[in-house]
C-alpha cells in the first residue's frame, strides 16, 4: 500500500468526503475531533503500529478502533488480545471490524510491512467447504500463486461480537436501542429500555455476541434493515477484561458521527437512511 490514500469509493456518501484521506475524514476525524475538544489525552497509531509494536499498545489505558476497521493481520489480533489481558481497555467504535485476515509482507525493496493481501477471515472455518473454495488464486506482481485460506480466530472473542449476516456482508441500517438502562454505560443519558438513538446503526454492524466471555452483557440490540427489510440482528456489548478493564463494542460504523460534525463534515447515508449527526446520548455514553 505505497499509495494508501485515495477517494473513499464505497457509495456511503453521495458527496464523497474522504478528500484523499482514505477513510480518516469520514470516520476517524469526528472521533478525534470530539476527543481533543473534550481534553482527552490521546495518541494516534496506525494498523501497522498495532501489528509491529505490541509494546506500544501498553503505553495507554485504552485502545480505540474507529469506523470501518475491517482488515487485520493475525499479529494485530494477538497483540490486541495481549493488551487486553495486560489490563488495557478496548473500545470498538465501529462495525464489520476485525473481519479479513491480511498478512503484512515486505515490499520488493525489502521494506517491512508494506504489502498486504486478503487471505481469509476472523471467523470459524465453514464445516462444509469444497477444496476449490479453500484456495484462492491471486495475481501478485507478475506471478500467480495459490494459497490456502488463512482463517484467524473468531473476531467475537476479541471484540465481543462480529459480523453476523446471512449474506456475509454485514450491511444494514437501523436505530440503536437500549437494552440494559441501569448499566453504567447509560449513566446520565436518561435512556430507558427500548429507547433508541435514531439511525445510529449503519452502514455495517456487529452481532453474534460471544456470551461465553466473562461478564458479557448485550447493552443495545435490534434489527438491521435494508429498504425496511430485516437483514440481521445487531448487538452492542460490554465484557470484562481480567484486570478491571473492559471491552466495549458499539456495533456500528456510524458511532463517531454521533459525536461530532467537524467543519466540512458530511453525515453519512446508506440504503436511503441518513445518520442524524451528533447526539448528546452518544456523547455521554462515550464519556462513560
Located regions from the model:
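The substrate-binding groove and active-site-proximal loops of carbohydrate-active enzymes
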Residues: 14-24, 59-73, 271-279
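Short alpha-beta junction capping motif
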Residues: 57-105
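Solvent-exposed loop/turn segments at secondary-structure junctions
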Residues: 49-52, 68-72, 96-100, 106, ...
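Extracellular ligand-binding/catalytic regions of CAZymes and related secreted enzymes
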Residues: 1-18, 38, 102-118, 168-288
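Loop/turn elements at helix/coil->beta-strand transitions in domains of secreted/extracellular proteins
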Residues: 37-43, 58-62, 85-90, 214-215, ...
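Acidic, Ser/Thr-rich peripheral helices and adjacent loops at domain boundaries
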Residues: 108-139
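Conserved anion/nucleotide-ligand pocket segment
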Residues: 134-191
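Aromatic-Pro/Gly-enriched surface loop or interdomain linker
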Residues: 1-56
Amino acid at each position: 500500500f505505497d499509495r494508501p490514500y485515495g477517494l473513499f469509493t464505497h457509495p456511503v456518501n453521495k458527496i464523497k468526503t474522504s478528500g484523499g484521506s482514505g477513510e480518516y475524514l469520514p470516520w476517524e476525524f469526528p472521533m478525534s475531533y470530539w476527543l481533543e475538544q473534550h481534553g482527552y489525552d490521546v495518541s494516534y497509531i496506525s494498523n501497522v503500529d498495532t501489528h509491529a509494536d505490541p509494546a506500544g499498545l501498553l503505553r495507554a489505558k485504552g485502545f480505540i478502533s474507529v469506523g470501518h476497521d475491517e482488515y487485520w493481520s493475525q499479529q494485530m489480533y494477538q497483540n490486541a488480545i495481549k493488551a487486553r489481558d495486560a489490563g488495557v481497555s478496548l473500545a470498538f467504535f465501529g462495525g464489520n471490524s476485525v473481519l479479513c485476515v491480511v498478512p503484512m509482507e515486505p515490499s520488493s525493496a525489502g521494506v517491512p510491512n508494506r504489502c498486504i493481501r486478503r487471505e481469509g477471515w476472523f471467523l470459524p472455518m465453514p464445516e462444509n467447504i469444497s477444496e476449490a473454495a479453500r484456495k484462492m488464486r491471486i495475481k501478485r506482481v507478475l506471478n500467480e500463486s495459490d494459497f490456502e485460506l488463512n482463517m484467524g480466530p473468531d473476531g467475537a472473542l476479541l471484540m465481543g461480537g462480529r459480523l453476523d449476516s446471512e449474506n456475509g456482508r454485514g450491511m444494514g441500517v437501523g436505530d440503536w436501542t437500549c437494552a440494559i438502562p441501569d448499566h453504567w454505560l447509560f449513566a446520565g443519558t436518561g435512556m430507558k429500555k427500548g429507547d433508541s438513538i435514531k439511525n445510529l446503526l449503519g452502514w455495517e454492524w456487529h452481532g453474534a455476541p460471544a456470551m461465553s466471555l466473562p461478564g458479557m452483557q448485550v447493552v443495545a440490540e435490534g434489527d438491521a434493515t435494508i429498504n425496511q427489510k430485516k437483514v440481521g440482528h445487531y448487538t452492542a456489548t460490554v465484557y470484562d477484561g481480567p484486570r478491571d478493564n473492559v471491552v466495549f463494542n458499539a456495533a456500528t460504523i456510524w458511532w463517531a458521527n454521533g459525536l461530532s460534525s467537524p467543519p466540512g463534515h458530511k453525515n453519512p447515508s446508506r440504503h436511503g437512511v441518513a445518520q442524524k449527526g451528533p447526539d448528546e446520548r452518544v456523547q455521554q455514553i462515550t464519556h462513560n
